[in-house]
Amino acid sequence: MQESTPVITIDGPSGAGKGTVARIVADQLGWHLLDSGAIYRVLAVAIQHHQLSLDDEEPLIPMAAHLDVQFEINSQGEAKVILEGENVTEIIRTEEVGGLASKVAAFPRVREALLRRQRAFSVSPGLIADGRDMGTVVFPKAPVKIFLTASAEERADRRFNQLKEKGIDVNIGRLLDDIRQRDERDQNRKVAPLIPAEGALTIDSTDISITEVVNKILMFANGKLT
């Protein structure tokens, strides 16, 4: 990691729009992108592939430390996630993997093992780091910190529509319950709870467009970086 490399962190709960916003901001600035949530999901898939149990943290640590993951961007600006040579882009976005990733993220030593890997993404000309503890733990000295949120109902609705477009039949009530449970787990865990970083700009995306969110971030960043 280069200490002088500027970093913009975008934290927030699942479904707030962090991934979409982060990709757009990274594209407009010509910076690198880190999807921290994807790394935890990739680790969750790796744990499944290697048939490891969540009852014991110990064997998960070396897997996290040596996780063979790559991020590739296609011509449409979409991220492709490669685990051990396999394209797991779609697999890691399932609700099952998302729930497992949240549980994996609660292990302190697993988080520590992934910490250096995430920080290694900070290279010139700059990095957009999307996650849940980017501004509080991974890049605490980042000059620009964003906390992006939205109501649980709005986030459930967005997820429902995403899955519906893919032909996946889901119950929106169950989605809402899952989101609320995940919020409670993430906000109350002892290690790296989901909270706004000190000095972060909080943006509620419930009733505003992606373009408006991006513009708010770029204006805030411009004031911090110039």
UniProtKB/Swiss-Prot annotation:
Reaction equations catalysed: CMP + ATP = CDP + ADP; dCMP + ATP = dCDP + ADP
Binding residue positions for ATP: G12, P13, S14, G15, A16, G17, K18, G19, T20
Chain ranges passing through the membrane: none
Major subcellular location class: cytoplasm
Cysteine pairings via disulfide bonds: none
Pfam family membership, one: Cytidylate_kin
SUPFAM superfamilies, per the entry: P-loop containing nucleoside triphosphate hydrolases
GO CC annotation: cytosol
Enzyme class: transferase
UniProt keyword list: ATP-binding, Cytoplasm, Kinase, Nucleotide-binding, Transferase
GO molecular function, one term: dCMP kinase activity
GO terms under biological process: nucleobase-containing small molecule interconversion; pyrimidine nucleotide metabolic process
Record localization: Cytoplasm
NCBIfam families attached to this UniProt entry: cmk
HAMAP family membership: Cytidyl_kinase_type1
Protein family per UniProt: Belongs to the cytidylate kinase family. Type 1 subfamily.
Name assigned to this protein: Cytidylate kinase
Origin species: Colwellia psychrerythraea (strain 34H / ATCC BAA-681) (Vibrio psychroerythus)
Gene: cmk
